[in-house]
Amino acid sequence: MVQTITYGREQEIPLKHPRETGKPSIFNDQKMKLGLFGSNCSGGLCMTDAPTTYEITWDHTKSIAQKADRLGMEAMVPVARWKGFGGNVNFNGTNFETFTWAAGLAEATDQITIFTTTHIPTVHPIVAANMATTIDHISGGRYGMNLVMGWFTPEMHMFNPSQLEHDERYQYGGEWLEFVERLWTAEGEFAFDGKYFQAKELESEPKPVQNPRPVLINAGNSSAGTDFSAKYVDINFASLDLEKMPDYTQAIKKKAQEEYRRQISTMTYGLVVCRDTEEEAKRDHQRIIDEGDWPGARHLMSIIGVESQSFGEQIEKFQERFIAGWAGQPLVGTPEQVVDGFQRLSDAGMEGMIMGFLDYNEEIDHFGAEVMPLMREAGLRY
Protein backbone atom coordinates (compact mmCIF):
# COMPACT_ATOMS: atom_id res chain seq x y z
CA MET A 1 0.00 0.00 0.00
CA VAL A 2 1.30 3.48 -0.83
CA GLN A 3 2.33 5.32 2.35
CA THR A 4 1.45 8.88 3.15
CA ILE A 5 4.17 10.96 4.77
CA THR A 6 3.04 13.92 6.85
CA TYR A 7 5.67 16.24 8.29
CA GLY A 8 8.27 13.52 8.00
CA ARG A 9 6.34 10.73 9.70
CA GLU A 10 4.24 7.89 8.35
CA GLN A 11 0.55 8.43 8.90
CA GLU A 12 -2.09 5.75 8.45
CA ILE A 13 -5.48 7.34 7.86
CA PRO A 14 -8.42 5.01 8.53
CA LEU A 15 -11.13 5.22 5.90
CA LYS A 16 -14.61 4.81 7.28
CA HIS A 17 -17.58 3.95 5.13
CA PRO A 18 -19.38 7.10 3.85
CA ARG A 19 -22.65 5.52 4.98
CA GLU A 20 -21.62 6.64 8.47
CA THR A 21 -22.20 10.28 7.55
CA GLY A 22 -25.79 9.51 6.53
CA LYS A 23 -25.87 12.44 4.12
CA PRO A 24 -25.96 11.39 0.45
CA SER A 25 -29.40 10.21 -0.67
CA ILE A 26 -27.81 7.31 -2.53
CA PHE A 27 -27.32 5.71 0.91
CA ASN A 28 -30.94 5.98 2.00
CA ASP A 29 -33.02 2.91 2.83
CA GLN A 30 -35.21 2.79 -0.27
CA LYS A 31 -35.41 -0.83 -1.38
CA MET A 32 -34.98 0.11 -5.06
CA LYS A 33 -32.97 3.28 -5.49
CA LEU A 34 -33.45 5.17 -8.74
CA GLY A 35 -31.42 7.56 -10.83
CA LEU A 36 -30.82 8.85 -14.32
CA PHE A 37 -27.83 7.89 -16.44
CA GLY A 38 -26.33 9.62 -19.46
CA SER A 39 -28.44 12.78 -19.61
CA ASN A 40 -25.37 14.92 -20.30
CA CYS A 41 -24.53 13.54 -23.74
CA SER A 42 -26.10 13.18 -27.16
CA GLY A 43 -28.24 10.09 -27.49
CA GLY A 44 -28.10 9.35 -23.77
CA LEU A 45 -28.23 5.55 -23.78
CA CYS A 46 -29.81 5.29 -27.25
CA MET A 47 -27.58 4.96 -30.29
CA THR A 48 -30.34 5.78 -32.74
CA ASP A 49 -32.00 8.21 -35.13
CA ALA A 50 -35.41 7.58 -33.57
CA PRO A 51 -37.24 10.90 -33.07
CA THR A 52 -36.90 12.62 -29.69
CA THR A 53 -37.03 16.11 -28.19
CA TYR A 54 -33.93 15.31 -26.10
CA GLU A 55 -31.13 17.80 -26.71
CA ILE A 56 -27.85 18.88 -25.18
CA THR A 57 -28.59 22.35 -23.83
CA TRP A 58 -28.11 23.55 -20.29
CA ASP A 59 -31.76 24.42 -19.76
CA HIS A 60 -32.78 20.96 -20.98
CA THR A 61 -30.32 19.00 -18.83
CA LYS A 62 -31.13 21.14 -15.79
CA SER A 63 -34.86 20.53 -16.27
CA ILE A 64 -34.26 16.77 -16.37
CA ALA A 65 -32.21 16.83 -13.17
CA GLN A 66 -34.71 19.00 -11.32
CA LYS A 67 -37.56 16.66 -12.25
CA ALA A 68 -35.58 13.68 -10.98
CA ASP A 69 -34.82 15.61 -7.81
CA ARG A 70 -38.49 16.46 -7.20
CA LEU A 71 -39.45 12.81 -7.71
CA GLY A 72 -37.07 11.83 -4.93
CA MET A 73 -34.63 9.92 -7.13
CA GLU A 74 -31.25 9.22 -5.60
CA ALA A 75 -28.68 9.74 -8.37
CA MET A 76 -27.71 11.66 -11.48
CA VAL A 77 -24.83 9.83 -13.18
CA PRO A 78 -23.27 11.27 -16.36
CA VAL A 79 -21.29 9.60 -19.12
CA ALA A 80 -17.78 11.01 -19.57
CA ARG A 81 -16.96 11.25 -23.24
CA TRP A 82 -14.21 13.08 -25.11
CA LYS A 83 -14.77 11.51 -28.53
CA GLY A 84 -17.92 10.16 -30.17
CA PHE A 85 -18.27 6.70 -31.69
CA GLY A 86 -18.62 7.77 -35.32
CA GLY A 87 -21.22 6.03 -37.46
CA ASN A 88 -24.34 7.90 -38.53
CA VAL A 89 -25.01 9.86 -35.34
CA ASN A 90 -21.56 10.02 -33.66
CA PHE A 91 -23.15 8.66 -30.50
CA ASN A 92 -22.31 10.64 -27.32
CA GLY A 93 -20.10 12.95 -29.38
CA THR A 94 -21.87 16.09 -28.12
CA ASN A 95 -21.71 16.27 -24.35
CA PHE A 96 -21.21 18.33 -21.23
CA GLU A 97 -17.97 17.75 -19.29
CA THR A 98 -18.98 16.05 -16.09
CA PHE A 99 -17.27 18.07 -13.32
CA THR A 100 -18.65 21.40 -14.49
CA TRP A 101 -22.00 19.74 -15.30
CA ALA A 102 -22.16 18.33 -11.77
CA ALA A 103 -21.24 21.65 -10.18
CA GLY A 104 -24.10 23.36 -12.00
CA LEU A 105 -26.62 20.66 -11.11
CA ALA A 106 -25.43 20.60 -7.50
CA GLU A 107 -26.54 24.22 -7.20
CA ALA A 108 -29.79 23.59 -9.11
CA THR A 109 -31.01 20.61 -7.01
CA ASP A 110 -31.82 19.91 -3.37
CA GLN A 111 -31.58 16.24 -2.39
CA ILE A 112 -30.38 14.05 -5.28
CA THR A 113 -26.78 12.76 -5.28
CA ILE A 114 -24.88 14.31 -8.20
CA PHE A 115 -22.04 12.27 -9.68
CA THR A 116 -19.15 13.04 -11.96
CA THR A 117 -17.72 10.34 -14.20
CA THR A 118 -13.94 10.47 -14.19
CA HIS A 119 -11.69 8.90 -16.81
CA ILE A 120 -8.78 8.44 -14.44
CA PRO A 121 -5.97 8.89 -17.04
CA THR A 122 -7.35 12.30 -18.08
CA VAL A 123 -7.08 14.20 -14.78
CA HIS A 124 -4.32 14.49 -12.19
CA PRO A 125 -5.23 13.40 -8.64
CA ILE A 126 -4.51 16.86 -7.20
CA VAL A 127 -6.90 18.51 -9.65
CA ALA A 128 -9.55 15.80 -9.27
CA ALA A 129 -9.47 15.94 -5.47
CA ASN A 130 -10.03 19.69 -5.33
CA MET A 131 -12.71 19.74 -8.03
CA ALA A 132 -14.57 16.94 -6.28
CA THR A 133 -14.34 18.70 -2.92
CA THR A 134 -15.67 21.89 -4.47
CA ILE A 135 -18.74 20.08 -5.82
CA ASP A 136 -19.25 18.35 -2.48
CA HIS A 137 -19.40 21.79 -0.85
CA ILE A 138 -21.71 23.24 -3.50
CA SER A 139 -24.08 20.31 -3.02
CA GLY A 140 -23.87 20.21 0.76
CA GLY A 141 -22.45 16.69 0.79
CA ARG A 142 -24.42 15.22 -2.13
CA TYR A 143 -21.52 14.50 -4.47
CA GLY A 144 -20.22 11.18 -5.80
CA MET A 145 -17.48 10.08 -8.20
CA ASN A 146 -17.89 7.37 -10.84
CA LEU A 147 -14.43 5.96 -11.56
CA VAL A 148 -13.60 4.77 -15.10
CA MET A 149 -10.20 3.43 -16.11
CA GLY A 150 -10.29 4.72 -19.71
CA TRP A 151 -11.27 1.80 -21.94
CA PHE A 152 -11.95 3.61 -25.27
CA THR A 153 -8.47 3.68 -26.82
CA PRO A 154 -9.16 6.21 -29.64
CA GLU A 155 -10.44 8.58 -26.96
CA MET A 156 -7.54 7.97 -24.58
CA HIS A 157 -5.08 8.53 -27.43
CA MET A 158 -6.31 12.13 -27.52
CA PHE A 159 -4.54 12.51 -24.16
CA ASN A 160 -1.66 10.04 -24.42
CA PRO A 161 -0.44 7.94 -27.38
CA SER A 162 0.10 4.92 -25.11
CA GLN A 163 -2.59 2.89 -23.35
CA LEU A 164 -1.96 0.63 -20.38
CA GLU A 165 -3.04 -3.02 -20.55
CA HIS A 166 -6.48 -3.76 -19.09
CA ASP A 167 -5.47 -5.07 -15.65
CA GLU A 168 -2.70 -2.50 -15.21
CA ARG A 169 -5.24 0.27 -15.79
CA TYR A 170 -6.91 -0.87 -12.58
CA GLN A 171 -3.56 -0.87 -10.75
CA TYR A 172 -3.01 2.68 -11.97
CA GLY A 173 -6.56 3.55 -10.92
CA GLY A 174 -6.01 2.16 -7.44
CA GLU A 175 -2.90 4.27 -6.90
CA TRP A 176 -4.64 7.32 -8.39
CA LEU A 177 -7.52 6.90 -5.94
CA GLU A 178 -5.24 6.38 -2.93
CA PHE A 179 -3.53 9.65 -3.87
CA VAL A 180 -6.91 11.42 -4.07
CA GLU A 181 -8.08 9.93 -0.77
CA ARG A 182 -4.95 11.18 0.99
CA LEU A 183 -5.61 14.67 -0.35
CA TRP A 184 -9.15 14.41 1.02
CA THR A 185 -8.07 13.23 4.48
CA ALA A 186 -4.47 14.17 5.33
CA GLU A 187 -3.89 17.07 7.72
CA GLY A 188 -0.88 19.20 6.88
CA GLU A 189 1.69 18.64 4.16
CA PHE A 190 2.59 15.14 3.02
CA ALA A 191 4.51 13.29 0.33
CA PHE A 192 3.25 10.58 -1.99
CA ASP A 193 5.63 7.98 -3.40
CA GLY A 194 4.03 5.41 -5.69
CA LYS A 195 4.75 3.57 -8.92
CA TYR A 196 2.86 6.04 -11.10
CA PHE A 197 2.80 9.20 -8.97
CA GLN A 198 5.48 10.88 -6.90
CA ALA A 199 5.04 14.27 -5.27
CA LYS A 200 6.18 16.23 -2.22
CA GLU A 201 4.87 19.04 -0.02
CA LEU A 202 1.29 18.17 -0.88
CA GLU A 203 -1.80 19.72 0.65
CA SER A 204 -5.45 20.17 -0.26
CA GLU A 205 -7.99 22.30 1.58
CA PRO A 206 -10.85 22.39 2.33
CA LYS A 207 -11.75 18.79 2.97
CA PRO A 208 -14.96 17.28 1.53
CA VAL A 209 -18.22 17.76 3.41
CA GLN A 210 -18.67 13.98 3.50
CA ASN A 211 -16.45 12.30 6.05
CA PRO A 212 -14.01 10.86 5.18
CA ARG A 213 -14.73 11.09 1.46
CA PRO A 214 -17.46 11.38 -1.19
CA VAL A 215 -19.38 8.38 -2.52
CA LEU A 216 -17.42 6.23 -5.00
CA ILE A 217 -18.89 3.98 -7.69
CA ASN A 218 -17.46 1.81 -10.47
CA ALA A 219 -18.87 -0.42 -13.21
CA GLY A 220 -16.01 -2.87 -13.66
CA ASN A 221 -17.32 -6.42 -14.05
CA SER A 222 -14.09 -8.19 -15.06
CA SER A 223 -11.89 -9.90 -12.48
CA ALA A 224 -9.69 -6.83 -12.14
CA GLY A 225 -12.75 -4.59 -12.14
CA THR A 226 -14.58 -6.43 -9.39
CA ASP A 227 -11.42 -6.54 -7.28
CA PHE A 228 -11.04 -2.76 -7.67
CA SER A 229 -14.67 -2.23 -6.70
CA ALA A 230 -14.45 -4.57 -3.72
CA LYS A 231 -11.34 -2.81 -2.44
CA TYR A 232 -12.24 0.82 -3.02
CA VAL A 233 -15.82 1.76 -3.91
CA ASP A 234 -19.26 1.79 -2.34
CA ILE A 235 -21.41 0.66 -5.27
CA ASN A 236 -20.60 -1.62 -8.20
CA PHE A 237 -22.82 -1.36 -11.27
CA ALA A 238 -23.40 -4.75 -12.87
CA SER A 239 -24.01 -5.21 -16.59
CA LEU A 240 -25.18 -8.82 -16.50
CA ASP A 241 -28.05 -11.07 -17.45
CA LEU A 242 -30.65 -11.21 -14.71
CA GLU A 243 -29.99 -14.85 -13.83
CA LYS A 244 -26.29 -14.12 -13.18
CA MET A 245 -26.91 -11.23 -10.80
CA PRO A 246 -27.51 -13.15 -7.53
CA ASP A 247 -24.23 -15.08 -7.70
CA TYR A 248 -22.36 -11.98 -8.86
CA THR A 249 -23.72 -9.89 -5.99
CA GLN A 250 -22.93 -12.55 -3.41
CA ALA A 251 -19.39 -12.97 -4.75
CA ILE A 252 -18.44 -9.30 -4.81
CA LYS A 253 -19.90 -8.67 -1.35
CA LYS A 254 -17.99 -11.67 -0.01
CA LYS A 255 -14.76 -10.45 -1.61
CA ALA A 256 -15.19 -6.97 -0.15
CA GLN A 257 -15.90 -8.32 3.33
CA GLU A 258 -13.36 -11.13 3.51
CA GLU A 259 -10.45 -9.59 1.61
CA TYR A 260 -10.85 -5.90 2.41
CA ARG A 261 -13.20 -5.78 5.43
CA ARG A 262 -15.54 -3.43 3.62
CA GLN A 263 -19.18 -3.19 2.60
CA ILE A 264 -20.30 -2.82 -1.00
CA SER A 265 -23.66 -2.80 -2.72
CA THR A 266 -24.65 -3.63 -6.29
CA MET A 267 -26.88 -1.72 -8.67
CA THR A 268 -27.49 -1.83 -12.39
CA TYR A 269 -28.44 0.42 -15.28
CA GLY A 270 -30.58 0.23 -18.38
CA LEU A 271 -33.17 1.71 -20.71
CA VAL A 272 -36.78 2.18 -19.67
CA VAL A 273 -39.47 2.30 -22.36
CA CYS A 274 -42.74 2.63 -20.47
CA ARG A 275 -46.02 3.30 -22.27
CA ASP A 276 -49.70 2.98 -21.44
CA THR A 277 -49.96 -0.26 -23.41
CA GLU A 278 -47.52 -3.10 -24.01
CA GLU A 279 -48.01 -2.71 -27.75
CA GLU A 280 -46.94 0.95 -27.64
CA ALA A 281 -43.91 0.17 -25.49
CA LYS A 282 -42.70 -2.65 -27.73
CA ARG A 283 -43.31 -0.53 -30.83
CA ASP A 284 -41.24 2.38 -29.52
CA HIS A 285 -38.48 0.08 -28.28
CA GLN A 286 -38.32 -1.60 -31.67
CA ARG A 287 -38.19 1.78 -33.39
CA ILE A 288 -35.07 2.65 -31.41
CA ILE A 289 -33.47 -0.56 -32.70
CA ASP A 290 -34.78 -0.30 -36.27
CA GLU A 291 -33.52 3.28 -36.60
CA GLY A 292 -30.35 2.49 -34.69
CA ASP A 293 -26.89 3.57 -35.76
CA TRP A 294 -25.67 0.12 -36.72
CA PRO A 295 -22.33 1.27 -38.20
CA GLY A 296 -21.61 3.13 -34.97
CA ALA A 297 -22.75 0.15 -32.91
CA ARG A 298 -20.48 -2.25 -34.79
CA HIS A 299 -17.57 0.12 -34.26
CA LEU A 300 -18.33 0.39 -30.54
CA MET A 301 -18.79 -3.34 -30.04
CA SER A 302 -15.58 -4.21 -31.85
CA ILE A 303 -13.68 -1.84 -29.59
CA ILE A 304 -15.32 -3.18 -26.44
CA GLY A 305 -14.75 -6.76 -27.53
CA VAL A 306 -11.07 -6.17 -27.99
CA GLU A 307 -10.45 -3.63 -25.27
CA SER A 308 -12.90 -4.18 -22.42
CA GLN A 309 -12.96 -7.52 -20.64
CA SER A 310 -16.03 -6.41 -18.71
CA PHE A 311 -18.18 -7.57 -21.64
CA GLY A 312 -16.14 -10.20 -23.49
CA GLU A 313 -18.28 -12.92 -25.04
CA GLN A 314 -21.53 -11.11 -24.26
CA ILE A 315 -21.07 -8.65 -27.11
CA GLU A 316 -22.93 -10.54 -29.83
CA LYS A 317 -25.73 -11.43 -27.45
CA PHE A 318 -26.11 -7.81 -26.40
CA GLN A 319 -25.99 -6.42 -29.94
CA GLU A 320 -29.42 -4.80 -29.89
CA ARG A 321 -29.00 -3.78 -26.26
CA PHE A 322 -26.04 -1.60 -27.20
CA ILE A 323 -28.31 0.26 -29.60
CA ALA A 324 -31.11 0.54 -27.04
CA GLY A 325 -29.59 1.01 -23.61
CA TRP A 326 -25.79 0.70 -23.70
CA ALA A 327 -26.12 -3.06 -23.05
CA GLY A 328 -27.95 -2.44 -19.79
CA GLN A 329 -31.17 -4.00 -18.52
CA PRO A 330 -34.16 -3.20 -20.79
CA LEU A 331 -37.43 -2.54 -18.97
CA VAL A 332 -40.08 -2.38 -21.69
CA GLY A 333 -43.83 -2.42 -21.15
CA THR A 334 -46.71 -0.92 -19.22
CA PRO A 335 -46.16 0.72 -15.82
CA GLU A 336 -47.15 -2.55 -14.17
CA GLN A 337 -44.69 -4.53 -16.29
CA VAL A 338 -41.89 -2.06 -15.62
CA VAL A 339 -42.49 -2.36 -11.86
CA ASP A 340 -42.40 -6.14 -12.23
CA GLY A 341 -39.00 -5.69 -13.87
CA PHE A 342 -37.75 -3.61 -10.95
CA GLN A 343 -39.02 -6.30 -8.59
CA ARG A 344 -37.04 -8.98 -10.44
CA LEU A 345 -33.90 -6.85 -10.23
CA SER A 346 -34.45 -6.34 -6.51
CA ASP A 347 -34.97 -10.07 -6.00
CA ALA A 348 -31.68 -10.67 -7.86
CA GLY A 349 -29.78 -8.51 -5.38
CA MET A 350 -29.77 -5.16 -7.13
CA GLU A 351 -30.30 -2.26 -4.72
CA GLY A 352 -30.99 0.27 -7.43
CA MET A 353 -31.05 1.16 -11.11
CA ILE A 354 -29.92 4.24 -13.00
CA MET A 355 -32.03 4.69 -16.12
CA GLY A 356 -31.97 6.15 -19.56
CA PHE A 357 -34.96 7.20 -21.64
CA LEU A 358 -35.24 7.97 -25.33
CA ASP A 359 -36.77 11.29 -24.28
CA TYR A 360 -35.69 12.03 -20.71
CA ASN A 361 -37.54 15.29 -20.16
CA GLU A 362 -40.88 13.98 -21.43
CA GLU A 363 -40.75 10.40 -20.19
CA ILE A 364 -39.69 11.19 -16.63
CA ASP A 365 -43.05 12.93 -16.11
CA HIS A 366 -44.88 9.78 -17.19
CA PHE A 367 -42.59 7.67 -15.01
CA GLY A 368 -43.32 9.83 -11.99
CA ALA A 369 -47.07 9.81 -12.53
CA GLU A 370 -47.57 6.16 -13.49
CA VAL A 371 -44.63 4.08 -12.24
CA MET A 372 -43.64 5.63 -8.92
CA PRO A 373 -47.04 5.06 -7.24
CA LEU A 374 -46.94 1.40 -8.28
CA MET A 375 -43.41 1.04 -6.90
CA ARG A 376 -44.68 2.29 -3.57
CA GLU A 377 -47.54 -0.20 -3.69
CA ALA A 378 -45.03 -2.96 -4.44
CA GLY A 379 -42.89 -2.01 -1.44
CA LEU A 380 -39.95 -1.00 -3.62
CA ARG A 381 -40.25 2.66 -2.63
CA TYR A 382 -41.94 4.59 0.14
Residue ranges and their predicted role:
Residues 32-36, 76-78, 114-118, 143-147, ...:
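Hydrophobic faces of well-ordered beta-strands that scaffold small-molecule active sites
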Residues 126-128, 133-151:
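Hydrophobic or amphipathic alpha-helical targeting/insertion segments
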Residues 2-40, 66-69, 166-212, 239-348, ...:
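An alpha-helical appendage that flanks or caps ligand/catalytic pockets
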Residues 45-59, 117-126, 162, 210-223, ...:
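Active-site mouth loops of central-metabolism enzymes
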Residues 34, 68, 72, 105, ...:
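Conserved, mostly hydrophobic/aromatic
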Residues 2-108, 207-214:
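N-terminal beta1-alpha1-beta2 module of alpha/beta enzyme domains
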Residues 227-242:
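A conserved active-site cap/scaffold subdomain adjacent to cofactor or substrate pockets
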